[in-house]
């Protein structure tokens, strides 16, 4: 079966990435939030593509540990991570703005020159992600979205990280399963630590 027609749901994460690189690079970018999923994806991507395009969204309120992990990722994986600034010099920081229009606007700017983007979302992270396909059309932006780890479990991630001795975000060792901006993130399993106490589990990027 040719790479153009193979069913990506039946192949490995590495094969999904290889397909994405073959089909879309250089108009392909990976979104990086420096969590355990990105530890795995960056390792796989740099094994597949010698010049990957990777970007992150800087809200101005990231954990210091996130900034440290950023540096470690660049050093270990030999990549220069593009910074998309979500801060506004004209408006004060608020959770509503940061977790809504600011991040979404920054993502749009980060993806303006691509035909596909790679994300680390996984189906087991919650009901809003349970239907994620390994390759799906992002109708909101008119491009493709690649989710190589869609069928991975938490155990799969840690097994891969330890087998390959990969750097990972230190807050994972302090009970943070999902890590976003400092004001909006607390320890917790799954995504329960994000916007704790609020009826919210997504910022809009993956909706």
Language-model segment annotations:
Residues 1-207:
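Nucleotide-activated chemistry modules centered on ATP-dependent adenylation/adenylyltransferase
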């Amino acid at each position: 079966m040719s790479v153009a027609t193979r069913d990506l749901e039946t192949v490995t994460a590495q094969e999904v990435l290889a397909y994405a690189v073959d089909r879309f690079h250089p108009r392909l970018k990976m979104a990086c939030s420096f969590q355990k999923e990105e530890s795995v994806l960056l390792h796989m991507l740099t094994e597949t593509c010698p010049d990957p395009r990777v970007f992150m969204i800087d809200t101005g309120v990231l954990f210091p540990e996130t900034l440290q992990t950023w540096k470690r990722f660049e050093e270990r994986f030999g990549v220069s991570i593009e910074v998309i600034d979500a801060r506004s010099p004209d408006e004060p920081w608020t959770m509503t703005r940061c977790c809504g229009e600011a991040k979404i606007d920054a993502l749009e700017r980060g993806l303006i020159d691509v035909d596909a983007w790679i994300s680390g979302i996984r189906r087991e992270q919650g009901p809003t992600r349970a239907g994620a396909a390994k390759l799906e059309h992002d109708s909101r932006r008119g491009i493709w979205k690649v989710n190589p780890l869609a069928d991975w479990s938490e155990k799969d991630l840690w097994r891969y990280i330890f087998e390959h001795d990969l750097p990972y975000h230190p807050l994972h060792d302090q009970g943070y399963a999902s890590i976003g901006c400092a004001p909006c993130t607390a320890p917790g399993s799954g995504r329960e630590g994000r916007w704790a106490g609020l009826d919210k589990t997504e910022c809009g990027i993956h909706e």
